[in-house]
Amino acid sequence: MAFGIGQGRACASQKLKPKARFDLKIVSFFCLGVLLSGLGAANATGPDGNGAYATGSYRNLFAEAGHSQAEIQHKIDGAFQQLFHGNPTNETVYYPAGSNSNGPLAFITDIKHHDVRTEGLSYGMMIAVQLNKKPEFDALWNWSKTYLYVAETNHPSCGFFAWQARTNGVRMSQFVAPDGEEYYVTALYFAAHRWRNGAGIYNYKQQADELLSRMRHRAPITGSMPMPWRNTNVTVTAGPLFDEKHKMVLFSPSSERNRFTDPSYHLPAFYELWSRWGASEDSEFWKQAADTSRDFFVRVTHPVTGLNPNYANFDGSFVTTFGRSNTNFSYDAFRTAGNWSVDWSWWEKDVRERQLSDKLQAFFESAGTNYGCQFTLDGKQMEPRHAQGLVAVNAVASLAANDPRAKKFVEELWNTPTPDGLERYYEGLLYMMALLHCGGEFKVW
């Protein structure tokens, strides 16, 4: 998550000009990554690939494991009920928050850190549209637009969403975390297709089109932004959320941290959709961004373990400016395997994604049934907690895996209870989306 003012005039878009330890393997790691990435996307038979987008058929890993559709639906419904409408003290992450002129408001909160994040709001919207829960979707979107959308034309985050706020809507950061915008855009397109467009902020397609255009084209803006953790203001220049030259999503568009990326923000399955649904003049860019991310997955993952760091430079090398912990496989990095596996499931354009899932699952199988949740890239465990969110994403990796071991990861997810307590925000949302993916219910709408 990146560092990270009310509604008003829209921001202008302006197009820009076009088992040895890892330290013994670092040279071969990056050389192998560059070599493999040069192979390009493989085995696609047409522009729509061979996956669920082309066939309309989504794998149901739970059914393949022998569970009935009634059991699967019961598990999905139960998890949603608990996380969205359960006991507010120790179960739910979704909280109604009154209403305004646009209707009901609700937020999803990070229980552990007592805040609201675009990550969670946009994940919640995606879950809601997949499950046909329009009231929850609209309430989360209304809260996002009311409290986090930045409309001031002289603000460096203009046209995007401040990534973090208190539960009362007061912003804790004025910066942008692009993974939120990525999920907002895709969830809005799905809502437009599933429910049709309404008026104002509920004209889902218009909202998605405008946000997507800004994500590539918004002109740089320089302004003063508060940094509460430093008890000062700083002058920041920020522009679009994607690097035009490298065709990669940024960790943050702000000038002090826009020269690197977060592997878990790379969502080629979404970029393929944007190339079809967004502005025609941007279609080729999003197609290239999808292929770039597929290459990047190979470059940034360890050639033996399949693990990736939290952050990486555009060439896949380590980002060291935020401390050693972000060169390891940690919480952000949980999600990356899910991203390449869903890309394979929907598009089947790059067979290397299957190899990545096999490597990753082979590593976690070798780590034992109670593997931890933070590792160096060569596999040294840094934290022993067996995280439900990581269990969830490792099951999603089975969508791309070839090896029969994949069934073990699906069955572990099936036997894992819905997260509750202190860790239920991140773990719970990853778990909920994993149930949808593994149950064949996370679809292109």
Predicted segments, located by residue:
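N-terminal secretory signal peptides that target proteins for export/translocation
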Residues: M1-F22
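Bacterial N-terminal signal peptides
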Residues: V27-G38
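Bacterial Sec-dependent signal peptides at the C-terminal "C-region" and cleavage site
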Residues: G38-T45
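Extended ligand-binding clefts on enzyme/binding-domain cores
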Residues: T45-H85, T89-T92, H114-T118, T153-C158, ...
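Internal amphipathic alpha-helical repeat/solenoid segments
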Residues: A65, K75-G120, A128-S173
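Aromatic-rich carbohydrate-recognition surfaces in CAZymes
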Residues: H114-G124, V170-R196
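Short glycine/serine- and small hydrophobic-enriched flexible loop segments
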Residues: M125-N132, Y183-R196, A269-R276, G338-V342, ...
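C-terminal functional modules
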Residues: G379-W445
